[in-house]
Curated annotation (Swiss-Prot):
Positions contributing to Mg(2+) 2 binding: 260, 262
Known cofactor(s): Mg(2+); Mn(2+)
Gene3D superfamilies named in the record: 3.40.50.20, ATP-grasp fold, A domain, ATP-grasp fold, B domain
Cofactor note (record): Binds 2 magnesium or manganese ions per subunit.
GO terms under cellular component: cytoplasm
Family: Belongs to the RimK family.
SUPFAM superfamilies the record matches: Glutathione synthetase ATP-binding domain-like
Protein species of origin: Shigella boydii serotype 18 (strain CDC 3083-94 / BS512)
Protein name: Ribosomal protein bS6--L-glutamate ligase
Domain ATP-grasp: 104-287
Gene Ontology molecular function, alphabetical: ATP binding; metal ion binding; ribosomal S6-glutamic acid ligase activity
InterPro entries in UniProt: ATP-grasp, ATP-grasp_RimK-type, ATP_grasp_subdomain_1, RimK, Rimk_N, Rp_bS6_RimK/Lys_biosynth_LsyX
Highest taxon in the source lineage: Bacteria
Enzyme Commission identifier(s): 6.3.2.-
Length: 300
């Protein structure tokens, strides 16, 4: 097969591993910067051009689209889809997952347990917003934040009010969430491919922090997950219509809670921690589903 990887930086670990895994299985691979793709939208002869040339047909596309370029990145991916390329995560699913409010609404509607969460835009009644999620301590986030940026733990009501007021000055959407103290700065990252959790790690925040993101210096170890956690991770990915997802789970006293569903999970931390060839599993999933039937379904 001919496979395109959409990424701004082909030197990143995840891109290199996906390329390596695809080549090992006999596929042709090209890494394309989605921002350098430009599209001819024409009912008679739509096409995608890249750096002065018309791109050939790709059997499959692996989107590694960063949050900062979600709009144009998903637009480029839609064009590949329209031309009959199988996407490892459809554009509409990626856009949905990037909308934190929409994601939580969908997960809640499916009965998937979440931390008690409130979302507001420049709330006038800060006190009521705090009460709505059960009071302090609580976590205050910018809805647009990623990798733990724009996330603050407010341990007292006064601190919570101060943080919310400061965020309100940014004219930003604010997410207020109960703090799961018993998780002790740890979460579980489940890597879902299709209908299977192929790997799971426990991420622990560095000392003095409560954010377990590996990008912020957190540590990782292999996690043994329960059947309930496995079921919830798969259900969360399926709810978001993602073939590949990183599902972050907190272990609370009342049971596992889904924190986030990531549509473009990094592979470095979880592959190096578990030793599992996740990139290879992703390529095998593509081999299974990038079929003539998909092209016929999409008109490709």
């Amino acid at each position: 097969m001919k496979i395109a990887i959409l990424s701004r930086d082909g030197t990143l670990y995840s891109c290199k591993r996906l390329r390596e895994a695809a080549i090992q299985r006999g596929h042709l691979v090209e890494i394309l910067d989605p921002l350098s793709c430009y599209m001819n939208i024409n009912p008679a002869a739509s096409s995608i051009h890249y750096k002065g040339r018309k791109l050939p047909h790709f059997d499959a596309v692996i989107p590694r689209i960063g949050t900062a370029i979600t709009f144009y990145g998903t637009a480029a991916l839609r064009q590949f889809e329209m031309l009959g390329s199988y996407p490892l995560n459809e554009s509409v699913a990626i856009a949905r997952a990037r909308d934190k409010l929409r994601s939580m609404q969908l997960l809640a509607r499916q009965g998937i347990d979440l931390p008690v969460t409130g979302i507001a835009h420049s709330p006038d009644d800060t006190s009521d917003l705090i009460d709505m999620v059960g009071g302090a301590p609580l976590v205050v986030k910018l809805v647009e934040g990623t990798q733990g940026i724009g996330v603050v733990l407010a341990e007292t009501r006064q601190a919570a009010e101060s943080v919310i007021d400061a965020f309100r000055g940014l004219n930003a959407h604010i997410l207020v969430q109960e703090y799961i103290k018993e998780a002790q700065g740890c979460d579980i990252r489940c890597l879902v491919v299709g209908d299977e959790v192929v790997a799971a790690i426990e991420r622990r925040a560095k000392e003095g922090d409560f954010r377990s993101n590996l990008h912020r210096g957190g540590a990782a170890s292999v996690a043994s997950i329960t059947p309930q956690e496995r079921e919830i991770a798969i259900k969360a990915a399926r709810t978001m219509a993602l073939d590949v997802a990183g599902v972050d789970i907190l272990r609370a006293n009342r049971g596992p809670l889904v924190m986030e569903v990531n549509a473009s999970p990094g592979l470095e931390g979880i592959e190096k921690t578990t030793g599992i060839d996740i990139a290879g599993k992703m390529i095998r999933w593509i081999e299974r589903y990038a079929t003539t039937e998909y092209c016929l379904k999409t008109g490709g």
